[in-house]
Regions:
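A compositional/biophysical signature of low hydrophobicity enriched in polar/charged and small residues
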Residues: 1-178
Length: 178
């Protein structure tokens, strides 16, 4: 498997992650459930922080993803703003973080130096707590999914293992509701 991110022209399904911010008076539960019921939505994950919902999308091609975003997300009542990240390559990680029950989960959006991209992916694949790695934005961003026994455990992974890595420029960590 290549570690250089590329958009596939193979006809294989393509994906995107959308971070959504809901308006102050929006019915969060209604937005969450109505989006989850849409064709092409593979997950709707409530998150804490700058954004309220992390939406995973899949479509047959990038054009259909873009159409979904334009037609369904922009017109969704209660969604104030969003940020889209197209999945260019995904590395599922096997092991304890990917298997079994965990009490805490998080997602992190990392700005990374593209020169060290391959080395970063290799380090993340070996890191305890990382359950999935997604490349986006031409290798300038990596989205990590983590699982652990507590939010503190996940924060410690970031403070002790991720933040000090050469090539990690900025981290935004979002705890998810289990």
């Amino acid at each position: 498997m290549s570690t250089q991110p590329e958009i596939s022209d193979s006809g294989a399904p393509v994906g995107a992650l959308l971070f959504l911010r809901c308006g102050k008076d929006a019915d969060f539960a209604e937005i969450h459930s109505s989006l989850l019921a849409q064709d092409g939505v593979t997950a709707s994950i409530p998150v804490f922080g700058e954004w309220n919902i992390l939406l995973r999308l899949a479509a047959k091609d990038r054009e259909n993803l873009q159409r979904f975003i334009e037609e369904r997300i922009r017109s969704c009542k209660g969604v104030e703003s969003f940020q889209a990240h197209y999945c260019e390559e995904t590395w599922p990680v096997s092991g304890a973080a990917a298997d079994g029950e965990h009490k805490a989960a998080a997602c992190a959006l990392l700005d990374v130096d593209t020169g060290g991209f391959t080395a970063l992916v290799a380090r993340f694949r070996a890191m305890a707590g990382v359950s999935e790695i997604i490349a986006s934005d031409g290798g300038k961003k990596i989205i990590l999914f983590l699982r652990g026994n507590s939010s503190r455990e996940i924060r410690n992974v970031f403070g002790d293992e991720v933040r000090p890595l050469a090539g990690v420029l900025r981290i935004k960590l979002f705890n998810t509701m289990n």
